[in-house]
C-alpha cells in the first residue's frame, strides 16, 4: 500500500476512535456514576465507568483503583466532555441510537486485514508532551471544582477544544473543520507557489481572541500558516518567525494532497526524527485528546493579531555568517558547484577578472550556439522564452482553482488526484483474480500475463528454471553469467529528479528561464553501452561476476569477521584487467622473463653432468631386459656368487684398508688436472671411475620404501642448500659441509621455508628431495666386495632423504610414452651396435639384438632394422644386417638426445611398480593409464594401491605444481603410512566432500521453516547473538540486517567446526570458496612439510621392538578396511528403515501381482473387466481416491483420504480389489502392520540406547576427569624383592617407601614405560568423548570412525615406547688402535689443544644454569619450578607484583641477562621474598625457597674466583687495571659521541689515496677516528692530552687541506667541540684514572729496578729495540676477551709484580695488531721437552717455532683462559655471535653507573694471530686524517 493511502487509513481510524469515545463520554456523563478510567486496564468498562461482569478485583482493590484518579486520568474525560456541545457537530450527524451517522460515500473498513503501523501515536505523544497555553475565559468555567485542580497539577491535560466564538467566527471555524465533511481537519487545496509567495505572519493563541475583528485576508493567511506551520499555534509570536515553513523543509509538500513519502524523504536526506525516542503504545482515549488538540491548534491560528503571550523569550541577535562554521553534513549534502561557477552570495569577494565560461557553451551543441552568437558565459540566452508577470499570479491561480472546483463538482470526483494516475486504478485487475483454481483449470494460464510478469508460480512452475524448461528454453551450462533483473531498470532521474519543473506549459509565461542541460554520462548506468564488450568463448566463459557481486555484497561482514579473528583476512587480489602494453616500449622484456608455467624454478644452475657410461647407457648399468626376479630386486640386488677370482674359493679372506689407495688416487687426479692446465676436470669417464674405493663417499638412505624415481649407477645429482633470507639484516646462510647455497624466495617444495631456515636437498633431473645430514656412528664402516677381495673404509656422513618431489613423469603401463621409449631404446641400441662394428660396410646380427631384448618379437626388431639396414641372404654378408649405403648413422650426441638416462629410470620405475601390483593380485586392466578425457572419472574408480603407483603419483604432483589440480596430501599414497608424508593423489581445485570421516557434514534437511532458519531470525536476536560472540557494539551498529545474519552464520559455523559453538543450529555446512580451499590446502601442506623436517632431522633413536604380532596387525587392517567400506555409504537409521519398508512394500506388491495373475486363469471374466478398468483409468488420467477408516486411542473412528495418481498403482489396486476377497487383503495388511510395528519397536529401542549413551557422555563431561582410586596396600611385603639402594627387602629402589628415594644425590628415576594411569590420560587427550561422529549406530550396525581407529593406533604406539636412562646403559667399548701396518687409517691424527675460547658471558651463564639445576633437584621445590597458575591461585598476581620462578630465571640466564652474580642472586632472593609475602615467613614453602637461596650462596662461594674473573672480563670497568677503564671511556666518547655527529662520515676512515691522490702530499700527519680507535685499543693514550692532540689534529688537517670555510672543516670543528664537551662531563672520573695509571707506572718502574733478572723475560741489560720504553706503550695486562688484541703471550702477573721488561714486551706485542676482538689470556702449550711452544694460527699445525725468528716464548697458562675454554661435553655453537659494531672493541658495554648492561650481546672471539716482536721504527706513525 502506498504511504498516502496509509495516512488516510490512519486518519479515518483516528476519527472513528474519536467519535466512539465522544459517544462513550456522553453515556458516561449521563450515567452519573464516578468514572474510573483506570479500570480499563483490568477489563471492559460499563456505561457508568465501572468494570463489567464479575471483576477479579475485590472492593478494597476497587477503592485503590478509584484513587488512581489522582494521577490525572479523571481530568482527561472531564476536559474532553466539557465543551462537547460547542464542537460544531450537532445532532444532525448523530443517528437515533447515538452513533455518528455515516456519509453516502463512506467505506466500511471493519473487515480490513492489513495492519499498518500506527505512526500517529508518536506525533500525538509529542504534541501531548508540549505545555499548552491556558486562557482566562476557560479558567473561569468550573467543571469539577474538587478534583480538577489536583488533576491538572499532577498531570496537565492537553488543551481543550476551541470555545465559543462570535457569530462571524463560527462560519470560519466551520469551514475549517467541516470542509472534509467530518470532525477531522484536512488542509484545503492551495498551490505551493501561492503559499510560498505570501509572507505569513503568525501569532500565538491569546486570551483576547474574541475581541479581534477578523478579515478575509487574515483568515487566508491564517489558513496558509496552519497549513505550512503546523506547530505555530503553540509557539510564541517571536518564535514562529524563526520557524521555516513546511514548504521550505519539504518542497514536495502539497496541502490537501496525499503525502508522497518518496518525494518528501528522498534518498540522502537526513530529516531529524523528533519522535524517535517516544513510546509507541498509548491508549485510545489519549489518542482522542491529542487529536483534538492538534485540530484546535491548527484552527486557532490568527496571523494578524500579535499580542504578547504569558512567556517572553529573549533571543540574542543571530551571529554573522563568518562567525558560524558550516555543519559537516550540510557541507557534504550541498551540490558540487561547477569549477566555472562563482558564488553569488559572496559579496565581499572581488569578482574574478577572468571571463566565466558556461559548462554547456562548448558542448555537443557548440555549432548552434556559435550560429546564434551566444557569449561564452551564456548570459542573455533564453531560448526565446518570456517570464510571466508576478502581479497577476494570485488572480490567475484563483481562476484556475475555481475552474477545477467547478469541474470536480460537476463530476463528483477529484480528477487530478494522484490515485487516478496509478496503474491499480487504470487496469481492471480485479477481473484477473483467481478465486478458485478449479474454475480456470480448463483455461490454463494466460501467456500474455505470464510474459508481463516474467513468470508466474504455479504447481508446475515453482521457480524460474522450471518455467524456462516449460517454455522450451534449454538450460545452459554457463551458470556463472551475471544475473539481471526481469524488471526494467529504473531511471533515477525520472524517479527521484524534479523533471516536472522543466515542463514548458507556456513559453510566454515561464516561471523561470531554463538553462541548457549539460550532458553527463553515468558509467554505472546499465542502460548505457560505453564500449564494445569483449567476446568470450562459449566453451570457456567462466565469468567471475557472480562471485564478485556476492563478494561485494558481503564486504562489510567479511571485514568484521576478519577483525574478530573468525576468518583470516586475505589481501584483496586485484582482479582488474592486465595493463595495456606500452607501444613505445620496444625492449621485449616479457620474452626474457623467467617462465612461470615451468614446473620447477631453477634456483641456481641445474646442469647435471652424468658419467660417460650413464650417458651412453652402458649395458650393466642400464639393462635392456629385466626378468620378474630382477624386477622384484629392483635397487636391492643380492650378493653375487663369483665363478672365478679370489672370492670364488671358500676360506678366510683378508680385508684391505683403502687409505693409501685413496691418497694415491687423489694425487694422480691432481697431477692429471695440473697437466691439463688446471681448472675443473671431469673424471667419471670409465666404469672403473665409478668405484667406491676412492674419492669422498657419503651414504643416502631413502625414507620411502619404493620411491617413484630412482637413479641408476653412474648418474649424477647435486646437493643444494636452499636458504630463505630473514627480513631486514640477514647474516647469511650458515656454512654447510656439502652442497652449494641457493637463496630462494619461493619454496621449491610443497611447504615453504621459514625465514632464516636452510634446507639441503638432492636435486637432479628426476626429482628433488630434502636431505638431512646425520653423523655416522663410530662403529659403522663400509665393506667393498670385489672378485679380488674385501676392502674396508671409513664412513663419515650419512643423509636421510625425505619424500621425493618428482620432476619427471613416469609413463603408465602400455601408454604411448612407454611404447615410444621401448621403440627408441631399441633403435638406439641398434645404432650403437653399428658404431661398434669394425666391418666395412657396418653389419650386425639379429641374434645380438634378440639376446639383449628377449621380450621383443622378431618382427618388431626387424621393423626397426629396416629403417637403416638391409638383410643380406647371399654373398659374404649372408644372414647379416648391413647398413644402408645412403643412411647416415646418428652421432653420439644425437643418440644421447634420443634416449636419456632419465627416461630409462622412469621406465624401470614403471615396470617395477607394475610387477609389485601383479604380485599383489591386480590384473593388467586395473592399472592401465587412462585417456586424458576420462581421467577425472577414472581417478574416482581405481584402487588405493594403484593410486600409489608411480605413474599416478608423478603425474599428480607435476599437475599440482603447474596449478592444474590439488593433491590429497593425506591419504592412501602417503609413503610413510602414518601421516608424515604427502599423498600424491589428484583432487579437483574446487572443494568437494572429503572421503574420510574426519569432518563429517551434518545433513541440513530440517533448516527451512524451523527456528534454525536464518530468515526467521529477528534483527534484535541476531544482534544479541553477535554480542554473545564478542563482537563490539560499534561494529554491530555499522551492519545492515543481512550483513548481521551473514556474520551470525559464519561465526556459528566456525564455532561448530571447532566444537565449542553453543548456537550450532545456525551453523551451515562448510561450503568453502575456492580461495578458502586453497588456503586450507597450503596450511595442510605446510604442516606435513614441517612434520617431515622435524622427524627426519631428529637424532633420537627409536626402538623398533614393539612386540607386535603380525596376526594382530592384519586383523586391525582388515577391520579398518571393513569400517571404511561401511563408511562409504553413510546412512542414518531413519534412512535404513525407510529402505527396508520400501523393499517390503515392493515384495508385497510383487506377491499380490503374482497372486492376481494366478487367479486370472480361473476367472477370465474378472480379468477382462480389470484390464478394461485399468485401461480406462490409464487413458482418462483420473486419480484414485481411497478412503481409509482408522480408529484412534479413544475408540473414535476417523477417515483419511489417500489420492493415487500413478496409473500403474491404480491398475494394481483395482486388480487386487476386483480379484481378491476381503480376508486375503486383510491378512496381508495385518502381516504388513505387524512387521511395521516390530520395526517401530526396534527403532524405539535403538533410539533409547542412543539417548542413554548421550546422557552418560554428558554426565561424564559435567563430572570432569575421574578421580584416581587409591591403590590397595599389599598386606604382606613381597619377600622376593630387594632394594638396590638401601638393601631392605620388600620394595625396589624406585618405590617411594625407600628411605633413600628422596635423597638428592640419587639420580631421579625415569619411567621405562607408561603406566596404566598415563595410558588412560593419553586416551582421554587423544580420543575425545564428545565427538559423536566417532561411533555411529545405524539401525543394528555400529560404525566406528576412521579417526577413532587411528587414535587407538596412536595410543598403542606411544604406550609401547620404552625409555632407558643413559646411566644404566652399558658403557661403549673404546676401540683399540691396531698394530698392523695396513691399519694406518686407525691412527687418529694429532689434534691441537688450542681449543676454542667462548664468550665470558656464555661461560657465566652456563655456571649459573648449573646452579639452577642444582636448586631444581632439591626436594619439594616443585612449586618454584614454573610460574604460578593464575587460574588455580587467582589472587596471587594481585598480591605479588614482581613474580619470579626457576623457569623464568633459566630463561633470563639463557638470554644472558645476568652479567654479574649480584643481579642473579637478587632475582633468586625475589622468590624468597614473594613466598614470604604470600605464604608468610614461617610457611614451609618459604623455608624451601630459603634453602634454595642458601644452596645458591654456597655454590657461588665455591666458584667465587672464577666468577670474579668472568665478571671483569664482561665489564672492563670492574677490572683492576685502570688503563682498561680509561681506554673504555675514550672509546665510548669516539663511537657514541664523535662518530654520531651528522655528516661526519668523511672523518671515520682514512682518506682513500685513489680518490684524493694529492692529500698525502699536503698532509704529513694524517689522522681519523678509526685510527684513534685503534690507538685506544692499543692503550696508546695514558692521558687526555695525548688523546686531544690527535683529535685537534683532525681539525688542523681539515683546515690545512679544505680551508677554514669548508663544510668539512665545520663538521671537524663540531667533532672537536663534542669531544671537549664529553671529556668535561667525565672530568672527575678521568682525572682519577690518570692519577692511578701514573702511580701504577711509577711503582712498576721502581719495582723493576729492584727485581732480579727473570730467565723467562729479557733483563735490563739485554739489548732491546730502540723504542721499547716508549711512554705510549701500554703497561697493563688485560683479561677482557672483548676488548684487547691477541694477548696469547701475556701472563697473569699483576702490575705490581711484572717487570718493566715484560711490560714493554707485552706492550710491544700490541703495536702491530689491528683486530679489536682479542683473546683473553695466554696458552699453556709445552712440548715434550718442557720448552714453551709458540701458538699456532687457526688451522695450523703448530710447528712455527722453527720457521719464525724473534718469537717470544710463552709464559704459563692463564686461569681465565682455562675458564673460557670449551670442554668436550659443551656445545660448540654457543659463541657463534658476531660483533655488530664492526671493530668496536667496547661496543658490548654501555657507560653506566653500575658498569654493566644486561641486555647487550657480546661479540665472538676472533682466531688468534701469531705473536711477533715488531720494531716501531717507521712502522707506528700516526694514522691518516682528513
Curated annotation (Swiss-Prot):
GO terms for cellular component: nucleoplasm; transcription factor TFIID complex. Residues 1660-1700, 1787-1797 have a biased composition (Polar residues). Changing residue 762 to I: In a lung adenocarcinoma sample; somatic mutation. Gene3D superfamilies: Bromodomain-like (1.20.920.10), TAFII-230 TBP-binding domain (1.10.1100.10). A motif (Nuclear localization signal) lies at residues 1370-1377. One of its GO terms (molecular function) is RNA polymerase II general transcription initiation factor activity. Residues 118-141, 532-555, 1252-1276, 1648-1826 are annotated as: Disordered. Residues 1252-1268, 1817-1826 have a biased composition (Basic and acidic residues). Keywords: Bromodomain, Cell cycle, DNA-binding, Nucleus, Repeat, Transcription, Transcription regulation. Residues 1395-1503, 1517-1626 form the Bromo domain. GO terms for biological process: male meiotic nuclear division; positive regulation of DNA-templated transcription; regulation of transcription by RNA polymerase II; RNA polymerase II preinitiation complex assembly. Its main location: nucleus. Pfam families: Bromodomain (PF00439), DUF3591 (PF12157), TBP-binding (PF09247), zf-CCHC_6 (PF15288). SUPFAM superfamilies: Bromodomain, TAF(II)230 TBP-binding fragment. The keyword DNA-binding applies. Testis specific, expressed apparently in germ cells. Residues 1714-1729, 1740-1750, 1768-1783 have a biased composition (Acidic residues). InterPro entries: Bromodomain, Bromodomain-like_sf, Bromodomain_CS, TAF1, TAF1_animal, TAF1_HAT_dom, TAF_II_230-bd, TAFII-230_TBP-bd_sf. It is found in: Nucleus. Belongs to the TAF1 family. May act as a functional substitute for TAF1/TAFII250 during male meiosis, when sex chromosomes are transcriptionally silenced. Can bind directly to TATA-box binding protein (TBP). Interacts (via bromo domains) with acetylated lysine residues on the N-terminus of histone H1.4, H2A, H2B, H3 and H4 (in vitro). This is Transcription initiation factor TFIID subunit 1-like. It comes from Homo sapiens. The lineage of its organism: Eukaryota, Metazoa, Chordata, Craniata, Vertebrata. The gene is TAF1L.
